Amino acid sequence: MAESKISIYPLLAVNFIGTLGLSLVLPFLIFLVERFGGNAIIYGLTASMYPIFQLFGGPLLGRWSDMYGRKKILLISQVGTFISWIIFLVAMLIPVTKIIDVKSEILGTFVLTVPLIFIFIARAFDGITGGNVSVANAYLADITSDADRSSVYGKLSVSTNLGFIFGPALAGILSVTIYGEILPVIAAVLISLVGILMIIFLLPESPEHTIHMAPHIRGSKAESGILKENIYSVSNKMGFLEIMKMQGIFRILSIYFLIFLAYNVFYTAFPVHAANNLKWNAASLGLYFSILSLLLVFVEGPLLSWVSKRYSDYLLLTSGSFMLIANFVLLVYSTDFLTYVSLVFFALGNGFMWPSLMSILSKTTKKEYQGAVQGVSTSFTSLASIVGLVAGGFMFSFFGTATFVIAASILFGVFLLSLKLDSSKKEDP
């Protein structure tokens, strides 16, 4: 089979490079936004630009990857990231020119400047071309067997976490030079360029990126128009509603949405909780997330590889969601000890649940529609990210640590849906 002939490691390297470039800049994005005239709310809007525009770009790029090939669309996505960092670099080099002073009851007081607009454009452009996640998931589904799928998605998550480990560390080293934050941005530009070169020269095209055609319409130049027409006719039918009608897809994507909703509530509320209730500083918070990333590398790497050969994706999804519920419940007690105990549950829960869910989605979807379905899943996660990022801060302001109980309740919905997902699978002939 073609599955065994293509190495996954070039794709993992491309994913690592993409995450590394992003995590180089995110640690000091808040300081740049404030320096260019923004406030905390504008920072939140800046951070949400990526998922807002990915909401529209992800499904389109996913469908295109079914039609034109995974490699071509991954290349477009990576070029988009490269251009977005160029725009970001321009924002840091141009003078801070004021456009208008804004005093709003909703957005607060801030100054709209030219560099601030450039940063908004950069994050939006990266989002609209941000189909790399959905296309990478579809690519892995093309080249791996069902038996190895969960383990392979775990390795993809490991490459992501490694990027988030090394990126902030490298940013810290580069930003203390005389060039300040501009050097990490230049590094992000160069790293994105390396990603482009790796896709061009090291990543082969997936052998399963288009629909399985009958032999009589493959081959000659005269027949190429028939092939193209057939690809278009089938792919054009795979709109949002058609994908939602596929058996089992809506339930799986609902789980996607709920997981990312709970995650983003956590990632918004926890730093405030750590600063106000645990009395942590930036170094303590950085240590916490570094330990989490290291634990995730272990869980999603060797541990998941071992357990996925012994237990089903459905069992790992269900048990993982239960562990994440325990993580959020422990956070309510606001002690350092229980917070770090909860960290273990977070790593185990996320490490078992997320790769298993991606594996289930890829196995539920026919090969010819992997890109389209993965693209729609990106929209679900983007929408959940937008809602969670906005709601998390407001909820913590009103409910305090009870916000984590709300996140646990959301994940209890994931737990119930995963039980039904397993039952529906058993009922299939």
Q: What is the predicted function of each stretch?
A:
Residues 58-69, 299-312, 396:
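Helix-to-loop junctions at the C-terminal end of transmembrane segments
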Residues 79-112, 322-334:
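C-terminal ends and interior cores of transmembrane alpha-helices
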Residues 27-41, 268-284:
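Short amphipathic helix-loop junctions that connect adjacent transmembrane helices
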Residues 16, 84, 98-131, 338-352:
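Hydrophobic core of transmembrane alpha-helices in multi-pass small-molecule transporters
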Residues 1-5, 206-253:
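Juxtamembrane intracellular "pre-TM" segments in multi-pass secondary transporters
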Residues 314-357:
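C-terminal transmembrane helical hairpin of 12-TM major facilitator-type secondary transporters
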Residues 51-59, 131, 164-165, 293-301, ...:
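Residue-level signature of mid-helix packing/kink "hotspots" within the transmembrane helices
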Residues 120-161:
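Cytoplasmic helix-loop-helix junction between adjacent transmembrane helices
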